[in-house]
């Protein structure tokens, strides 16, 4: 599956969080847990994906667009997420 993203949002995330949307493929290639973000109607399906990037649990927000995953967010998991999600991923 192809990965797309807004280049400006990617640069902002690299600068502010030290994470690069271009590395999302490494997360998707491993064991992940994905849930649909149904907190509100965004006008499109949004998926929250938990997975490992270089040994660290990260959270990626994306929307499926045809054969692509369009990344809109990427961040390090917080302590509560690590506690809750890590056992489900068996990490």
Q: What is the meaning of each model-derived region?
A:
Residues 1-91:
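Ribonuclease/tRNase effector modules and their secretory precursors
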């Amino acid at each position: 599956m192809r990965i797309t993203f807004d280049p400006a949002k990617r640069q902002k995330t690299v600068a502010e969080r030290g994470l690069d949307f271009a590395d999302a493929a490494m997360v998707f290639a491993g064991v992940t847990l994905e849930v649909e973000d149904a907190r509100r109607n965004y006008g499109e399906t949004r998926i929250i994906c938990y997975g490992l990037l270089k040994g660290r649990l990260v959270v990626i927000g994306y929307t499926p667009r045809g054969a692509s995953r369009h990344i809109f967010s990427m961040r390090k998991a917080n302590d509560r997420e690590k506690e809750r999600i890590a056992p489900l991923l068996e990490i």
